[in-house]
Amino acid sequence: RISSYQFDPPIDSSDMEPAFWAKLVEIINYNYNSFDGFVILHGTDTMAYTASALSFMLENLSKPVILTGSQLPIGTLRTDGKENLITAIEIAAAKNPDGTAIVPEVCIFFENHLMRGNRTTKINAENFNAFRSFNYPPLARVGIHIKYEPNLIRKPDLSKPLKPHYLFDTNVVILTLFPGIQEGIVSALLHVPGLLSLIHI
């Protein structure tokens, strides 16, 4: 059984924000016991951000949450969206012989690669191979068959129920230092009203 839910109006991925992440978590939590897995169709600009956020917001996750999308609109002749969607659904429904999910974590599926959500970055806006996981190997590769990598896939504690988190504090800023950065820029960031945390990368 496949069911669908759509935001009304649809959200452009460039407008994604924590409130929408919380809504996604709410939908997954409400339907958690009714489905084997979940597929989220998402624009590519902020897909990696959403996947990373959901991986932390869905504590004790034991079912697949697969994000996918396309580089070309799904209505165009050469779109990659149809294959990405069909394969994402197959992965979300895939089970081990004991009935547990093969990939019980938040992932991005794109161009024949299944990647851990919080390790994935968008690297290209022109090619179908738009995402890459630099510091962690793909969890599965897709050709004629889907080849999973069981040793790389997170093993959930099935004794623990899903624990959803909804609140994000947005009073946080990321600062990248580089040679020649002006002291006034750093000072301005440090004195933003209500700022609770500054992350240096």
Task: Label the model's feature ranges.
Residues 40-63:
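Short Gly/Thr/Asp-enriched flexible loops that form oxyanion-binding sites at enzyme active sites
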